[in-house]
C-alpha cells in the first residue's frame, strides 16, 4: 500500500483551513483598526498636550483649527497664536513667517470628524487663565472611534465611542 494523502483528504484539509481563516480574518482586521486608532490618538494627544504646555508658558491666546481633504482622505491640525491671518495646514506655504504656527499631520487610514473646520477654530486656548473653549472632535479609523473633549478648565479628555452626537454632524 502506498503512503500519502488522497485528493479527498487534501480537499477536506483545505476546507478546514479556509474556514479557520474566514473566522480569524475579521478579528485580525478589528485589532488592526484598533492599533491604527490607538497609535494615532497617542500621537495626537501628545501634540495637543505639547501645545497646551506652550500656551501655559505664554500670555497669548492660541487657536486650534482642523482642516481636512475628503477627496485625498487626509486631515491635519493647526495650532497658532491668535492673529488676523489664519494658517491652513493643508496649505502651509500660505502661512506667513511671523505667525507662530504648529502643524500636525495625520497618518493614513484615520479621519477627523468635527462640526468646525478651517477657517473656524476648533477651540481656543488661553495662556492667561489656562483655559480652553469647550469643544470636541472625533478621531476615526474605519469603524473605531475616539472622542477628544476640551473642557473650559483647560483639560483634554479621551473617551471611546461616548457622546459622539454632540461632536459629529448628522450628514457624516
Stretch-by-stretch model annotation:
Residues 1-29:
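N-terminal single-pass transmembrane signal-anchor helix
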Residues 23, 29-35, 42, 53, ...:
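N-terminal helix-rich module
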Residues 45-50:
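Phosphate-interacting basic helix/loop segments used at nucleotide- and nucleic-acid interfaces
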Amino acid at each position: 500500500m502506498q503512503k500519502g494523502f488522497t485528493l479527498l483528504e487534501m480537499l477536506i484539509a483545505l476546507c478546514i483551513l479556509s474556514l479557520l481563516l474566514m473566522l480569524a480574518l475579521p478579528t485580525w482586521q478589528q485589532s488592526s483598526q484598533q492599533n491604527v486608532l490607538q497609535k494615532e490618538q497617542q500621537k495626537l494627544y501628545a501634540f495637543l498636550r505639547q501645545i497646551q504646555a506652550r500656551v501655559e508658558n505664554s500670555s497669548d491666546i492660541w487657536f486650534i483649527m482642523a482642516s481636512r481633504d475628503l477627496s485625498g482622505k487626509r486631515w491635519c491640525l493647526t495650532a497658532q497664536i491668535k492673529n488676523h491671518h489664519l494658517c491652513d495646514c493643508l496649505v502651509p506655504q500660505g502661512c506667513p513667517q511671523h505667525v507662530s504656527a504648529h502643524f500636525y499631520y495625520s497618518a493614513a487610514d484615520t479621519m477627523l470628524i468635527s462640526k468646525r473646520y478651517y477657517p473656524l477654530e476648533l477651540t481656543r486656548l488661553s495662556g492667561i487663565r489656562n483655559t480652553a473653549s469647550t469643544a470636541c472632535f472625533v478621531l476615526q479609523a474605519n469603524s473605531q472611534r475616539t472622542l477628544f473633549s476640551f473642557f473650559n478648565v483647560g483639560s483634554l479628555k479621551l473617551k471611546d465611542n461616548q457622546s459622539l452626537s454632540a461632536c459629529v454632524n448628522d450628514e457624516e
